[in-house]
A protein has these predicted regions:
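Short helix-onset patch at the extreme N-terminus, typifying the N->h transition
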Residues: 6-9, 38
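Zn2+-dependent peptidoglycan hydrolase active-site motif and core
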Residues: 78-132, 158-164
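Bacterial N-terminal signal peptides
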Residues: 8-20
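Short, conserved secondary-structure segments in the cores of folded domains
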Residues: 71-74, 129, 135
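A detector of long soluble domains/segments in diverse envelope-associated and cytosolic proteins
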Residues: 126, 137-138
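Surface-exposed, glycine-biased beta-strand/turn segments
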Residues: 17, 21-95, 99-104, 140-141, ...
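Positively charged n-region of N-terminal signal peptides that target proteins for export
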Residues: 1-4
Length: 207
């Protein structure tokens, strides 16, 4: 019996060496590719990876908060698509959803609901979404779609856009996509600024 047990153990070790275990859920956790445009001006936005951070009531954060310098900071479509929802509710506040190709959707939550010079919470929708942005409207990547605010349960917090990215009906961590978009768009901003400076004074260099 001891010899049989030793043989089985040796066989198991050999099998492990030949066929090492793959990381659990390696395939299901891989993020599918999706190149997007950063949804706010890079020089007016701060953000971090707050995916699944704890929230009140035992909730987990299902997106990334893009902290804006001020209310009415411009919000842009991250990719071409069609607006499928423009709505308001107590938690999300004023928000919109864009459906993109290949099963992707982007959510823009806590949009502005105040007037230009008040914190009333009942400002006109013309200060929430851009002209022509309504359900069924086609939008392009980088198109102005609305303005950041503190509507819903974000009231009293720093103005921001709670941004979500969904793929085939399920939310994904948007941070890696946003980080890549931020780097691309910010580099483009610096190039445009350098071009402008070159036209004024070629000796000034942006680093």
């Amino acid at each position: 019996m001891k010899q049989v047990g030793a043989f089985v153990a040796a066989l198991a070790v050999g099998f492990t060496l030949l066929f090492p275990a793959l990381p659990a859920q390696a395939h299901s956790d891989a993020s599918p590719p999706f190149e997007l445009r950063f949804p706010q001006e890079t020089d007016k936005t701060r953000f971090s990876n707050d995916w699944r951070a704890r929230r009140s009531g035992g909730r987990r954060h299902s997106g990334t908060d893009l902290i804006a310098d001020a209310k009415m900071t411009e919000v842009y479509a991250v990719a071409d698509g069609v607006v499928v929802k423009v709505n308001d509710n107590p938690r999300a506040g004023r928000y919109l959803i864009i459906e993109h190709a290949d099963g992707w959707e982007s959510y823009y939550i806590h949009l502005n609901n105040d007037g230009l010079d008040d914190d009333s919470g009942d400002g006109p929708w013309m200060l929430t979404v851009a002209p022509g942005v309504e359900e069924g409207a086609l939008v392009e990547a980088g198109q102005l779609i609305g303005w950041a605010g503190d509507s819903g349960n974000a009231e009293g917090n720093s103005p921001h856009t709670h941004f979500e990215l969904h793929f085939q009906g399920r939310p994904l961590n948007p941070y890696p996509y946003l980080e890549a978009a931020f780097e691309r768009d910010h580099a483009d901003l610096l190039r445009r600024m350098q071009t402008l400076l070159n036209q004024i004074d070629g000796s000034v260099q942006i680093t």
